[in-house]
Amino acid sequence: MTSNTEKSLQILKEEIQRLEEQGISGHILEELMEFRRENDTGDAAEERCIRPQIPFFGKEVLEMAIAALLAGENVLLCGGKATGKNILAENLAWLFRRPTYNISFHVNTDSSTLIGTDTFRNNEVQLREGPIIQCAKTGGFGILDEINMAKNDAVSVLHATLDYRRAIDVPGYERVVLHPATRFIGTMNYGYAGTKELNEALVSRFVVINMPSPDEETLNQIGRASCRER
């Protein structure tokens, strides 16, 4: 057995133990492991499988998010600052062992930022793929960070990607069908400068999870886990 394999097995053992200590359902853990067995990442995307520096603690939220993703749903994490939205998103991608694509939304985000843009190469016009298409093809987990910072007409291009169609139609190019393992995790803050109200058509394409503020015990767990990682 190679040292890399031994290290991977040790990491897996630690992850399962941490989830069990939080009281995560054994049935959910079994389904999670089955998902990982059925959806091999492949060497090409392995470098995007990034182990988070900070683990996420919160049994109810973790169970809801994992169960939704296992059911093929996309997840929208809502809450104020410092509630662990991005930490949870990164941990979910790692637990499912999927390549991660972090996509930060802002007021100037448009369809070309997300899907791609035309470029001239080898004497022909080709599509320079954006992160959404790359994520779709590799079976990645796309983290749509602060999705409510962008204008609604900019994110409407994602409707067919996020609903039952699970596809991306780019005019002039082939239709991209999402890899079965592809999921999207949105994060959004409420009521901060520059944020916008998401329209119902977009929100309906996610399972919405409201993030609670961490209590003292959760903060202590994070601190202890961070010390062990060093």
Predicted regions and their residues:
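AAA+ P-loop NTPase catalytic core and its hallmark functional loops
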Residues: T2-R228
